[in-house]
Amino acid sequence: MGKINAENTSKHVTFSKNAFIPVCNWCRNVCGYCTFRNENFKLLKMDEMKEILTKADTFGCREALFTFGENVDENEKVKEELKKMGYSGILEYLYEISAWCLENTNLIPHTNCGILSYDELKYLREVNASMGLMLENSSARLCGTIAHEKSPGKDPKLRIEMIENAGKLKIPFTTGILIGIGETFEERVNSIFEIKRIHEKYGHIQEVIVQNFRSKPQIPMENYKEPSPVEMFKMIILSKLILEDISIQVPPNLNRETGQLFLMAGIDDWGGVSPLTKDFVNPEAPWPDIEELNIFSKELGFTLKERLPVYEKYITEEWVDKKILEKIKK
């Protein structure tokens, strides 16, 4: 244990003060553990997003987390709504609000919207300092389980391809694994090694999230057992040992009772925390106050340190679009 804690010689634990913008909550995937997707979808209007971003700026937020379901353009109703507003698709819509965000607020965009092609990633790189996609698990076996049997976008080959494409494009990237969706211990470890393999090739993975499944009412996996703190503890230690210099994050709103335990295990980031918006993926789990996180961290001798959505070592011309870099350096 001493060795794990010694790795974080700075004794800092970071977080990003963000605003969560759920651009659209329809998705082509129907995952067994998800409550974000809704057939009666809501597509946020441009003015609604601008209002949230403007307010977030007054709260001192520095990350704009743009999220929507995968391939929302497959939904004809979404497509029609976008067309009426003058947009060819969701990515053009996202690009415009991201560009507006950069020009009119102090927030920096970070997008997580499911599978994107190489060209789509390249397009969005112009207005995003970093991007993300959870690997969840590298095992194709899970595609035939209740977790992913109705989710074509959860094919690990597709997700690995996108993470690699982000590396080719030098996009600072956040990924992670999901614990407790029917995977074996070996599959968890293999997933971490797959992330390591990709990072060793491209060097772009800035953080890895070790996220625990949480049961929710009225989901197919409602009665599935949640992973124990011991299971999470093991995976955090292993992830830290395997991934070495990559930051390890555990969402604090999903782990209020065990967060300090996981800090001792080796995490060095609390992820995005918003003083304004809720976690729309886990709406039942409110964010802790930043002061609460500060106390959490201080009690174990760690200093809470705010960061941007892009990690400091990636804030260079090699990794960030010139316009965004100029904004960050101001």
From Swiss-Prot:
Task: Point out the signal peptide segment.
Answer: none
Q: Which organism is it from?
A: Methanococcus maripaludis (strain DSM 14266 / JCM 13030 / NBRC 101832 / S2 / LL)
Please give the name of this protein. 7,8-didemethyl-8-hydroxy-5-deazariboflavin synthase
Q: State the protein's purpose.
A: Catalyzes the radical-mediated synthesis of 7,8-didemethyl-8-hydroxy-5-deazariboflavin from 5-amino-5-(4-hydroxybenzyl)-6-(D-ribitylimino)-5,6-dihydrouracil.
Q: Which UniProt keywords apply?
A: 4Fe-4S, Iron, Iron-sulfur, Lyase, Metal-binding, S-adenosyl-L-methionine
The UniProt catalytic activity note for this protein reads:
5-amino-5-(4-hydroxybenzyl)-6-(D-ribitylimino)-5,6-dihydrouracil + S-adenosyl-L-methionine = 7,8-didemethyl-8-hydroxy-5-deazariboflavin + 5'-deoxyadenosine + L-methionine + NH4(+) + H(+)
How many and how are cofactors bound here?
A: Binds 1 [4Fe-4S] cluster. The cluster is coordinated with 3 cysteines and an exchangeable S-adenosyl-L-methionine.
Return the SMART domains for the record. Elp3
Q: Which residues form the Radical SAM core domain?
A: 13-253
- Return the EC number: 4.3.1.32
* Residues binding [4Fe-4S] cluster: C27, C31, C34
Q: Which residues cross the membrane?
A: none
Q: Which cofactor does it need?
A: [4Fe-4S] cluster
Indicate the quaternary assembly: Consists of two subunits, CofG and CofH.
Identify the Pfam families for this entry.
Answer: Radical_SAM (PF04055)
Q: From what superkingdom does this record's organism come?
A: Archaea
Q: Which GO terms describe its molecular function?
A: 4 iron, 4 sulfur cluster binding; 7,8-didemethyl-8-hydroxy-5-deazariboflavin synthase activity; iron ion binding; transferase activity, transferring alkyl or aryl (other than methyl) groups
Name its pathway. Cofactor biosynthesis; coenzyme F0 biosynthesis
Enzyme class (EC, first level) = lyase
Q: Which family does it belong to?
A: Belongs to the radical SAM superfamily. CofG family.
